[in-house]
């Protein structure tokens, strides 16, 4: 996958190109990230990248000419046709389905806004989609862009040692993930559930599914409303709820 980033602070992206799963993907040649700074496309000696909004009001907007030139340069460098994304609070909220959808693209261009945002005509003429990581305001689009890349690259074949890790994570099937345990067997008097040490893979699979359903019911019940549970899943969820209610009496 190729990702082009338009940012006034391209140095921030070394945190994902040099470290962790994304860094390993870069080293393996499975992910390539190029950055363009609108400041490098300015035409004045002060390298100005902001401008006043028409109609007045507080704050500044990103200047059109340097931003548009940076976008055009990124498009020419893309591996094939790239989907252009503007990270924006007004965009579609990123979720697991959206991540998997974006992972189908060979190339993405991510525009990281600053100040009060960008000229609406840039969005209309240059941007394919707007995406948001949540209903809150940040100082720029760099962190949302890095979040998007980190989530999407997990679905690039070969990035994860075990692709099942991506398929079984929280939200991959619309549910929260089940609890996980490692050594020691007993920690401060709390033991690992016996079923996980039984070696019976069928029982372990059912336990994990039940815990995943139950944890979703406890913590994010609205997610269950989006799912069509099978009879077996309904049975496991009902069993979890009975056991949970009995444990708090």
UniProtKB/Swiss-Prot annotation:
Q: Where in the cell is it found?
A: Cytoplasm
Keyword tags: Cytoplasm, Methyltransferase, S-adenosyl-L-methionine, Transferase, tRNA processing
Matches recorded under SUPFAM superfamilies? alpha/beta knot (SSF75217)
Question: Which EC numbers does the record give?
Answer: 2.1.1.228
- Alphabetized Pfam families for the sequence: tRNA_m1G_MT (PF01746)
Q: Which residues bind S-adenosyl-L-methionine?
A: 113, 133-138
Q: Give the highest taxon in the source lineage.
A: Bacteria
Per UniProt, what is one GO molecular function of this protein? tRNA (guanine(37)-N1)-methyltransferase activity
Any one annotated GO CC term? cytosol
In terms of InterPro entries, this protein maps to: Alpha/beta_knot_MTases, tRNA_m1G_MeTrfase_C_sf, tRNA_m1G_MeTrfase_TrmD, tRNA_m1G_MTases_N, tRNA_MeTrfase_TRMD/TRM10
BP GO terms, sorted: tRNA N1-guanine methylation
Q: Which reaction does it catalyse?
A: guanosine(37) in tRNA + S-adenosyl-L-methionine = N(1)-methylguanosine(37) in tRNA + S-adenosyl-L-homocysteine + H(+)
Note the subunit structure.
Homodimer.
Similarity remark: Belongs to the RNA methyltransferase TrmD family.
The record, for NCBIfam families, names: PRK00026.1, trmD
Free-text function comment from the UniProt entry: Specifically methylates guanosine-37 in various tRNAs.
| Identification of the protein by name | tRNA (guanine-N(1)-)-methyltransferase
């Amino acid at each position: 996958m190729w990702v082009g980033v338009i940012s006034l602070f391209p140095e921030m992206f070394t945190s994902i190109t040099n470290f962790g799963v994304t860094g390993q993907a870069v080293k393996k040649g499975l992910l390539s990230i190029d950055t363009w700074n609108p400041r490098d496309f300015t035409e004045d000696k002060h390298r100005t990248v902001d401008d006043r909004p028409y109609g007045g009001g507080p704050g500044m907007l990103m200047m059109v000419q340097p931003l548009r030139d940076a976008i055009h340069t990124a498009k020419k460098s893309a591996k094939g046709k790239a989907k252009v994304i503007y990270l924006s609070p007004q965009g579609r909220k990123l979720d697991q389905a959206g991540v998997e959808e974006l992972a189908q693209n060979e190339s993405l261009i991510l525009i990281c806004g600053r100040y009060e945002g960008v000229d609406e005509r840039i969005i209309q003429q240059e941007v394919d989609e707007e995406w948001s990581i949540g209903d809150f305001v940040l100082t720029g689009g760099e962190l949302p862009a890095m979040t998007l890349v980190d989530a999407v690259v997990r679905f690039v074949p070969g990035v994860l040692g075990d692709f099942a890790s991506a398929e079984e994570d929280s939200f991959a099937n619309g549910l929260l993930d089940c609890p996980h345990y490692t050594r020691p067997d007993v920690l401060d008097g709390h033991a690992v559930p016996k079923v996980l040490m039984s070696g019976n893979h069928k029982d372990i699979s059912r336990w994990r599914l039940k815990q995943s359903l139950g944890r979703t019911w406890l913590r994010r019940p609205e997610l269950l409303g989006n799912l069509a549970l099978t009879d077996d899943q309904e049975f496991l969820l009902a069993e979890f709820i009975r056991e949970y209610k009995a444990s708090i009496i």
